[in-house]
Amino acid sequence: STSRRQRQMCIRDRSGSISAFNFIKEKVKNLEITPAQLALDPCSGSCVITDVKTGELLACVTYPGYDTNRLANTVDSNYYNLLYQDLSNPFYNNATQQTTAPGSTFKMVTASAGLTEGIISPGTTILDKGQFEEVANGPKCWIYPSSHGSINVSEALRDSCNYFFYKVGYDLSMVNGTYNEDHGVEMINKYSSMYGLDSKTGIEIAESKPKQTTEFPITSAIGQSNNSFTTVQLSRYVTAVANSGTVYNYTLLKQVTDSDGNVLETYEPTVKNTMDNISESTWDAIHSGMKMVVETHEQFDGLTVDSAGKTGTAQQVPTRPNHALYVGYAPYNNPEISIATRIAYGYTSANTAELAASVYKYYFHLEDTSTLLDGQAEDVGAAANAFND
């Protein structure tokens, strides 16, 4: 066909040959080969969508997956062996078992702590000096040697300014004018616990335990150090951000029936805790900053539903790409759903932001479903591989 010939012309190099790289890239773009089949970075991901008003899990997705029908009753042994040997690890639930540092998606925790403890107010500005030199081996802002200038907490969320949150983490660590690392860790964990990041979410399948930081409050304040959470745990956290402080215990079950269809037991999410000590002005500052994040990311351009969110990247292995993360909610003024998504070794959060935008298009019927599910893979461009938070 003409379209097929055009595609082939696009992937030929100057000599007229089709390189192996371009050939494979085109196959992936046209959904003829899946990332899981390649088992190259990135080839796995997860996404959790939640009703922020009730805590109901609307979707808890791990990729790659498999056909459970072929493993029920009479097990298809050949299929099982293929899955078992698959280098993309389809048996591993990336939504509930994979833990990584949350990266900058954690910054709303630090903002909550700084604002509530009186370290900063919504209008307090901090000058980004590039490198934070109040501690040994001072960490740098991602924009170093440039600077974000003098910004407040909402703008710091918008710009994902590491220096701003280093300073908040440092000030949270002060005891009688002296820097105390243990106290800083305690303060950060106090607020991450309020968001439910100290415990499992309650789902009835295998879930890894969250790990709160035990050291380095300066880098912990930007979601690094040894903070480590699953996607479903980040979902519970951002759901609480969206609804201004209600933390839910999740369930994956709806009801149990007998063989005649009679309901024996029903299941609903329950409220774990409410964050009554967080002021309305604090929520306003956080929500405003998250809205500005979306406004500065082109992945959300053209969406007719306003949303708010936070990007994040986390390095786990120096020889592999960063993990990419995104948490957010929509609509902005009257939230219905939250989203938490991670692409392991996904380079940067531009890729997860693109995924979140596609979820919004699907949920709010902003684009034809068949185009979203059966069209081409998104082409986020070279900018998606640039470090920006």
Question: Positions of the model-derived regions?
Answer:
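Intrinsically disordered, low-complexity acidic/polar segments
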Residues: 336, 348-350, 366
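Long, highly charged amphipathic alpha-helices
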Residues: 187, 285, 354-358, 362
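Short, charged, low-complexity patches
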Residues: 234, 348-357
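Beta-lactam-recognizing serine transpeptidase/beta-lactamase-like catalytic domain environment
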Residues: 5-8, 12-345, 384-389
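Short, gly/Ser/Thr-rich active-site loops of penicillin-recognizing serine hydrolases
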Residues: 263-265, 270, 357-389
